[in-house]
Amino acid sequence: MQRSLVGSEMCIRDRDATAITKIYNEYITNSIISFETEPLTEEDMLSRIVQISSKYPYFVYETDGIVVGYCYAHAWKERAAYRYTAETTVYLSPAYTGRGIGTLLMQKLIEECRNKNYRALIACITDDNIASKSLHIRLGFKQVSHFKKVGLKFDRWLDVVDYELLLTP
């Protein structure tokens, strides 16, 4: 089984948008993990990938040539003073969860963010997403907030928690 990380220093390929769109749309349509409610087109996803990866680290995980997960950093807030803080995002194909891929992706992302002199990373997680919360805790993130009933999806009010990882002392 061949596995590889493809990232921003190598380039995200246009063809990756197809797999990334499929992975993300699964979470949009069938879960409360993403707060988006309408599936994205490949064109929309490619546009996002190009925009994000031009400024921030973006990594894709492949197994046997198939994209099964991805993660990236992006702006946490738009004001200039926040420029050394980034928000993290990680998604895996549901068939590939629980195999350590999310950990590998996030470790690479954290390393790259350190190399780019980010000071802090923030993960905004749906409170019911136990797997993501556990992943972030294992990676050293600490919960710093809990917002109650801030999202409505599938006729259900959802809480969101923020986790923070300080990259420098």
Regions picked out by a protein language model, each given a short descriptive name:
Residues 113-125:
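Conserved GNAT acetyl-CoA-binding A-motif
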Residues 97, 123-133:
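Conserved beta-strand-loop-alpha-helix junction that forms the acyl-donor binding cleft
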Residues 88, 121-123, 163:
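A structural signal for short, well-ordered beta-strand segments
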